[in-house]
Amino acid sequence: MKMWLLVSHLVIISITTCLAEFTWYRRYGHGVSEEDKGFGPIFEEQPINTIYPEESLEGKVSLNCRARASPFPVYKWRMNNGDVDLTSDRYSMVGGNLVINNPDKQKDAGIYYCLASNNYGMVRSTEATLSFGYLDPFPPEERPEVRVKEGKGMVLLCDPPYHFPDDLSYRWLLNEFPVFITMDKRRFVSQTNGNLYIANVEASDKGNYSCFVSSPSITKSVFSKFIPLIPIPERTTKPYPADIVVQFKDVYALMGQNVTLECFALGNPVPDIRWRKVLEPMPSTAEISTSGAVLKIFNIQLEDEGIYECEAENIRGKDKHQARIYVQAFPEWVEHINDTEVDIGSDLYWPCVATGKPIPTIRWLKNGYAYHKGELRLYDVTFENAGMYQCIAENTYGAIYANAELKILALAPTFEMNPMKKKILAAKGGRVIIECKPKAAPKPKFSWSKGTEWLVNSSRILIWEDGSLEINNITRNDGGIYTCFAENNRGKANSTGTLVITDPTRIILAPINADITVGENATMQCAASFDPALDLTFVWSFNGYVIDFNKENIHYQRNFMLDSNGELLIRNAQLKHAGRYTCTAQTIVDNSSASADLVVRGPPGPPGGLRIEDIRATSVALTWSRGSDNHSPISKYTIQTKTILSDDWKDAKTDPPIIEGNMEAARAVDLIPWMEYEFRVVATNTLGRGEPSIPSNRIKTDGAAPNVAPSDVGGGGGRNRELTITWAPLSREYHYGNNFGYIVAFKPFDGEEWKKVTVTNPDTGRYVHKDETMSPSTAFQVKVKAFNNKGDGPYSLVAVINSAQDAPSEAPTEVGVKVLSSSEISVHWEHVLEKIVESYQIRYWAAHDKEEAANRVQVTSQEYSARLENLLPDTQYFIEVGACNSAGCGPPSDMIEAFTKKAPPSQPPRIISSVRSGSRYIITWDHVVALSNESTVTGYKVLYRPDGQHDGKLYSTHKHSIEVPIPRDGEYVVEVRAHSDGGDGVVSQVKISGAPTLSPSLLGLLLPAFGILVYLEF
């Protein structure tokens, strides 16, 4: 073996062992050269578990594998750790994909993986299982009939045929396909074994049943022979207790999966099923089916592990079942390997850590072959260590792969990519670090010289392990030419730079402490001396954070008058601006800093630790802790309240009335009983009121008897033999307790004894007392008070009201009608003589409608007529009139009937010409012929109006034309409609204009045959 060693050149050797043991050595330029930027295979697609249906007509199956690599990778496949014979006609490769023609279960079922390799190494894909799916038919034998007494539970066994895989779904046919059983609380189909369970059999269950099995993996379904079910009638069905027959077992679930538990019970009556997690709340993702028999937990997590219980219960008894869900976890990376380059001869610890449940084990592959187990450490690496590595973390539930390429670097020192700075500046009295960072592998040894003098470590000079040179307490004599030498077993190199000594930067005018009040301005001075050959900048920081003058220019401003002056102006200072300000004067060589404190006096900060104690009906005790006084003593505290009925905070009355600044407890008084409150505390000093504390938790004061009487007590009116009493309900804040209501008291005006009734609805303000013996329009005294569970409140002032008057007893006479059109009828009548009439009501309904659906029109007692509108054309209507007052309506008049007229013509007049003649327009239209169900045309109405307005001049004519004046300015609209006994028909319109024409020309002739409007001027 020969090794090429070039000084100042990089040698990267990538060694790969792939199936046969070949070794490649590659030589590179400085780092990875332009002509060689290769890398080992990186998988982009890997094979997955595949189920091939045995009855498939496709005749082939594909396992995919694709990797990215430079140069392009070569692919191989292995099955059950043996090479796949790609020379066989049964196998072919499409890219990296393996295609198996005419798959055979005996030959092809097994575990496959793909190998991708190039001259950098080889990687192995994840393993994939190729299996063959099938679902055999049910046996051809007939199923025996099943006889069950009504009211008893029963199970029909599915007994599915041989199959793979196990992900079957089950349904049951009733009598014929595709009539499937609907699951409910009484009937259940287990998706675990396929059995049909009926909690108690009914006569309606009679029929022939077949188990219908589907395999979604191979898209095949089969069904069993039909099982006759014959319920045996019972004179009386006996109840029996719940008996759980579908029981879930302990489950091992993988985190992130969906878990289904089944629980079903027989019993009469049908048992109710309840689910719970023992000693813990149910998972938030849990769902229970409508029937209650299925519990599904979606996206199960580790914290969902535990014991789950289902309980079935009916009136005769209950049954319970418990089992545990164990939640396991697929491996997941905590830390994995990545492509790495290391120096030859160095050590490498390659961390590869995974979590999972159970805890995964770690094993390693190198170039596709087993290499190591557990933690991987390489010592004194050589070229033989280069290659493609794979870290595999696996537990019971699967494996995850992390792939990486390890390259070994061998390089003589070179400064070509990173030479020393030609000029290094350092301040007198300061410290400088001169970097020396050549590329080299293995790591070189470093030495330094100044001019012709070799440097060694001393109290001022230190050569770092990475080659950097540190000089402390710099003097003018330290200036000069410095050279760094680097040497390893592959060569040596050096680089030179010049150290220039500058004057140090010094703060000559430092900021001083300041004390201001909120809203005032403050100035922080700062000036510095520095080397005139350098540029000086000032940086201000506040409490350790650099001030951004662009974002914070509202409050911060710098003085740029002199280069050596970095004065800071703080404008309109707020409490948040109090703290330590640091001025840093800096050049590219060094810096100097000085600090000062700014005190901002202002209103106090918010009190803390607010607590509510000793809650009573109208007061509560509060305690709190002092907040910041912001450099001005707190003089007093204010307690504020907010009720559930308001969004506004209000100052509360307190005991003591004035809460001194040294107090940390007080009572809020004069509160509303049985009211929800929040409280907060505000501190005040000579500079103002501060921020409020965080509001307390909402509390409710104790209840108390009402102390406010209802207002606006009155009433009267209503129906016959009624006394209506009204009041203004008390608002929620005056309820003062639970079970709030009203006590209504009333008596005849000259009576002695008050009658009292209780109204329990707190929101009502009305009570109606009915008494058939009550005389109409009788005076009563009434009063109202509120009550709650704590007692009664005061009565309101006594009000005097009258009981309801009697409804009118006379019916209107001389009722008549006049049919106005197809949609309107006018009704008139003679007034009744009774004085108690307040209004008249007209009831009307079409002959084809029921009287109960009658429409009503109400008019005042002064009216003698009313108009009924929006009626149907050519329709018979029945009409009656009654006199009314607040007690109701009296007897109706004799019912009369009327027929609306036929509908007006639906055909609009067709305007055939609009001719200008001198100072007038002549508009002509065709005669409108009414249909058989329409009113005969009796004439025409013409509306002449300005365009855009609704009002104008209305003309009536029996002719088919009309003359209208030429508009003086603007456009006018001429609307023409037919008129009939049934009303006005549909409108036609034409626009005319008074604008002059350029010459006598066509101006206004409508050619009827072609629908063309042409104009003529004479």
Swiss-Prot record:
Disulfide bonds join 65-114, 158-211, 263-310, 352-391, 436-484, 526-583. Residues 41-131, 137-223, 241-326, 331-407, 413-500, 504-601 form the Ig-like C2-type domain. GO terms for molecular function: carbohydrate binding; cell-cell adhesion mediator activity. GO terms for cellular component: axon; extracellular exosome; glutamatergic synapse; membrane; plasma membrane; postsynaptic membrane; presynaptic membrane; side of membrane. GO terms for biological process: axon guidance; cell adhesion; cell-cell adhesion; central nervous system myelin formation; cerebellum development; gene expression; locomotory behavior; Notch signaling pathway. Monomer. Interacts with CNTNAP1 in cis form. Binds to the carbonic-anhydrase like domain of PTPRZ1. Interacts with NOTCH1 and TNR. Detected in a complex with NRCAM and PTPRB. Interacts with TASOR. This is Contactin-1. The gene is CNTN1.
